[in-house]
Amino acid sequence: MSAVIIDGKAVAARVRADVARDVAEFRAATGRQPGLATVLVGDDPASAVYIGGKRRSCVEAGMADLHQHLPADTPQDEIAALLDSLAADPAVSGILLQLPVPEGLDGAALVGRIPPEKDVDGLTTASVGLLARGLPGLRPCTPSGIIELLDAYDVELSGAPTVVVGRSELVGRPVAQLLVGRNATVTICHSRTRDLAAVCRGADVLVVAAGKQAIIGADAVKPGATVIDVGMHRTEQGLRGDVDFDAVREVAGRLTPVPGGVGPMTIAMLLRNTLLAARAAAEVGSLV
């Protein structure tokens, strides 16, 4: 029997609808409009497309689009000054610096200018520390979107043998920490893992964020397992993931497609984070 296909578009649409409703209620109750400041340095076509999608989604959710576009030759200190200004601006609920930045700029240092309470990407050292300690904070969008998908399909995480393939700072490590926070029993695999397929076959839940096309085949999947494919690779046949979809769908119990699985969740969770940041700021403001 073929796997149940996890519909990321449908789950993301529900999250977006919930956020839009909650934004309207927030604005009515507080008189404030959540604002997302996206910062794009340079004219990289792919980055421009990504930012455009985030900006449109922001407006559709009823938030203020506070976009900032800087030339590629903008000095580091000028970008830092802009980020500091946005951090101090009460109209800005969340700040997102589109990565990568142009060559010659220190992207990590620039991201570090964003205060954790406005770090809607969940990428700053402070945000990473809050996640590692299990303390409240804004979580990285793609990892939190993965958890949202698992919850939407009633995947039991507590006690579940779970394997994460990939240890990147953007997805692998944070999703492993989120899964541990849900009491899953987590193993992290990477390029030096011995007999990767054998390790993966022990998983009830398998999250693949390796950045290598079709690294996971049917031989690496336990029958009935839930498989989340985070990879995205452009090929002559279209977008493909880190999982051999056609082979794995005949073994897995649930499986995300590429495209249409994890991808749509990222912007949906960005919108949710921006609303959460706006709510937290309003609560702090009410106490001042």
Swiss-Prot record:
NADP(+) binds at G166, R167, S168, S191. One of its GO terms (biological process) is methionine biosynthetic process. Pathway: One-carbon metabolism; tetrahydrofolate interconversion. Keywords: Amino-acid biosynthesis, Histidine biosynthesis, Hydrolase, Methionine biosynthesis, Multifunctional enzyme, NADP, One-carbon metabolism, Oxidoreductase, Purine biosynthesis. It catalyses: (6R)-5,10-methylene-5,6,7,8-tetrahydrofolate + NADP(+) = (6R)-5,10-methenyltetrahydrofolate + NADPH; (6R)-5,10-methenyltetrahydrofolate + H2O = (6R)-10-formyltetrahydrofolate + H(+). One of its GO terms (molecular function) is methylenetetrahydrofolate dehydrogenase (NADP+) activity. Its EC number is 1.5.1.5, 3.5.4.9. GO terms for cellular component: cytosol. Catalyzes the oxidation of 5,10-methylenetetrahydrofolate to 5,10-methenyltetrahydrofolate and then the hydrolysis of 5,10-methenyltetrahydrofolate to 10-formyltetrahydrofolate. PANTHER family: C-1-TETRAHYDROFOLATE SYNTHASE, CYTOPLASMIC, C-1-TETRAHYDROFOLATE SYNTHASE, CYTOPLASMIC-RELATED. Belongs to the tetrahydrofolate dehydrogenase/cyclohydrolase family. This is Bifunctional protein FolD 2.
